[in-house]
């Protein structure tokens, strides 16, 4: 391993932001870019109005290009680290993509609205983090508004996200009486000031809770803070780096993203403690980030919504080695060698051609329909297939009906290609010729119907279907499996890759099937082959 590769890989921090819509994720993302991008590049913080104007111009330009990849991946420098931030879309475009983003990162940041606590979408995404033992940090946002008590917020996180909380900062008051936060690690007081654009005044060093300066700055609230600190000292969970890296414990920060408050402490701790690029399991072995030979895996495909250009962008996570412009790579699923001349890297404020990139970086490769999610690219001829990019059991189902029967072939082609892209899952029942679509979010069905019309000239509609949930089924005992398939034939289907799935009409039917056939596995995820 070259010392440069080792050095560059060690600088990378690749993470995703997880939150429920309206918890302030977009605002926090902008503030992270402000601390990491604008401050580094401009040397000063622009007025917020001007910054907002610049951002909106930038987005308009993106719209003209017809593809909004900038919201998906952003890279920015911070304190000699290179941070790759992956956005998980909000509920409007919630899809399996959101889950798969979490397979491309080494850690995650959960944003929680202090007034609402943990919400449904956050739970689903945390399930994926838990499955992969992903280290998670938590930012409790909107402390400048009326909120739940911080102990209640942490209890909510521990109960619903099944992870222990270690507070790193502690809020002093909330809403109109919000005075700031106390940094438990460095024993510093950060005073909140909604004036000056809410920028942090330098931390005031306090020598423990008995320091008389505490009363000077906080007045009546000093005593409450002392009581809180005594309680945390006695009953709180201290930060443990090892447990954080195992995904067992989350450091918790309190603040107000819109006022830039509490963001810097979290970002400082993030670049210090979050893991760099991690080893990646392949079917035959584990690939270490420091290996000289380049390897990468595609975790997302974004369609170009510009109808004039059918191109798609494949998002590839670099797992090892150095990527350089124009290098020849082996595309393992097709067995072909390809030259990657015009890959893209996504900087905080623009997209640029990649000259070189390192483990942990995300690059975009133009794709004319030949690249699929889960595809592996390598520099060497070694046969390699990265694992761990799953399909998730859909939660919503619709049947697709064709208005013009003569377009059956185009419908099949369109649905197969869209399923390949990961936009939706396609199931073909064993007992009829229906096309059943399964999706994580209902909006995906509208997207599919619109794209069938636009891109494939197919006029189709979708309608309800009596499927409640899907499970991929597997059994080592062939006799039991054959009996199961005979008994449930009317509820079985194959997906786009030929895997057998049980489409349960209701929860009771699924429960009954699982009780009747205990040796059959009913899986909620399936590895993409």
Swiss-Prot record:
Gene3D superfamilies: P-loop containing nucleotide triphosphate hydrolases, Peptide chain release factor 3, domain III, Translation factors. Residues 10-278 form the tr-type G domain. CDD domains: RF3 (cd04169), RF3_II (cd03689), RF3_III (cd16259). It holds the Pfam family GTP_EFTU. GO terms for cellular component: cytosol. GO terms for molecular function: GTP binding; GTPase activity; translation release factor activity, codon nonspecific; translation release factor activity, codon specific. Belongs to the TRAFAC class translation factor GTPase superfamily. Classic translation factor GTPase family. PrfC subfamily. This is Peptide chain release factor 3. It comes from Nitratidesulfovibrio vulgaris (strain DSM 19637 / Miyazaki F) (Desulfovibrio vulgaris). The lineage of its organism: Bacteria, Pseudomonadati, Thermodesulfobacteriota, Desulfovibrionia, Desulfovibrionales.
């Amino acid at each position: 391993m070259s010392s440069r590769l080792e050095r560059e890989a060690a600088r990378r921090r690749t993470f995703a932001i997880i939150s429920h819509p309206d918890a302030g994720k977009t605002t926090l993302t902008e503030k992270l870019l402000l601390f990491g991008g604008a401050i580094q590049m401009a040397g000063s913080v622009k007025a917020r109005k001007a910054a907002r104007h610049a951002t909106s111009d930038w987005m308009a330009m993106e719209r003209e290009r017809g593809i909004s990849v900038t919201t998906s991946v952003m890279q920015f420098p911070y304190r000699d680290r290179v941070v790759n931030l992956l956005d998980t879309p909000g509920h409007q475009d919630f899809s399996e993509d959101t889950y798969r983003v979490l397979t491309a990162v080494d850690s995650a940041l959960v944003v929680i609205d202090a007034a609402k606590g943990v919400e449904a979408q956050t739970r689903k995404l945390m399930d994926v983090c838990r499955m992969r033992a992903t280290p998670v940090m938590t930012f409790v946002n909107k402390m400048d508004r009326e909120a739940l008590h911080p102990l209640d917020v942490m209890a909510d996180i521990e109960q619903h996200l099944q992870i222990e909380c270690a507070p790193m900062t502690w809020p002093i008051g909330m809403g109109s009486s919000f005075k700031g936060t106390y940094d438990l690690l460095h024993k510093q007081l950060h005073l909140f000031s909604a004036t000056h654009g809410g920028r942090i005044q330098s931390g005031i060093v306090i020598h423990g809770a008995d320091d008389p300066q505490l009363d000077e700055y906080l007045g009546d609230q000093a005593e409450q803070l002392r009581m809180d600190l005594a309680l945390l000292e006695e009953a709180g969970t201290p930060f443990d780096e090892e447990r954080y890296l195992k995904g067992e414990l989350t450091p918790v920060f309190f603040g107000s993203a819109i006022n830039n408050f509490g963001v810097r402490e979290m970002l400082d701790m993030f670049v210090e403690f979050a893991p760099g690029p991690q080893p990646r399991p392949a079917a035959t072995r584990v690939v270490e980030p420091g290996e000289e030979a380049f390897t990468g895996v595609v975790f997302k495909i974004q369609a170009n919504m510009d109808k004039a250009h059918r191109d798609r962008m494949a998002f590839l996570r670099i797992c090892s080695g150095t990527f350089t412009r124009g290098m020849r790579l082996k595309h393992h699923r097709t067995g072909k060698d390809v030259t990657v001349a015009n890959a893209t890297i996504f900087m905080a404020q623009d997209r640029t051609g990649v000259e070189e990139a390192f483990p942990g970086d995300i690059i975009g490769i133009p794709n004319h329909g030949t690249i699929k999610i889960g595809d592996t690219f390598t520099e060497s001829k070694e046969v390699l297939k990265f694992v761990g990019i799953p399909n998730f059991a859909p939660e919503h189902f619709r049947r697709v009906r064709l208005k013009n029967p003569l377009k059956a072939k185009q419908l099949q082609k369109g649905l197969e290609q869209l399923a390949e892209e990961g936009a939706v899952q396609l199931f073909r029942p064993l007992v009829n010729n229906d096309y059943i679509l399964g999706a994580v979010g209902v909006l995906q069905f509208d997207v599919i119907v619109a794209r069938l019309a636009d891109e494939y000239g197919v006029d189709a509609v979708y309608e309800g279907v009596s499927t409640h949930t899907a499970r991929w089924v597997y059994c080592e005992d062939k006799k039991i499996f054959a009996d199961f398939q005979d008994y449930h034939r009317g509820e079985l289907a194959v997906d786009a890759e030929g895997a057998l799935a049980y489409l349960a009409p209701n929860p009771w039917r699924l429960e009954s099937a699982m009780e009747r056939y205990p040796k059959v596995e009913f899986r909620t995820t399936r590895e993409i082959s």
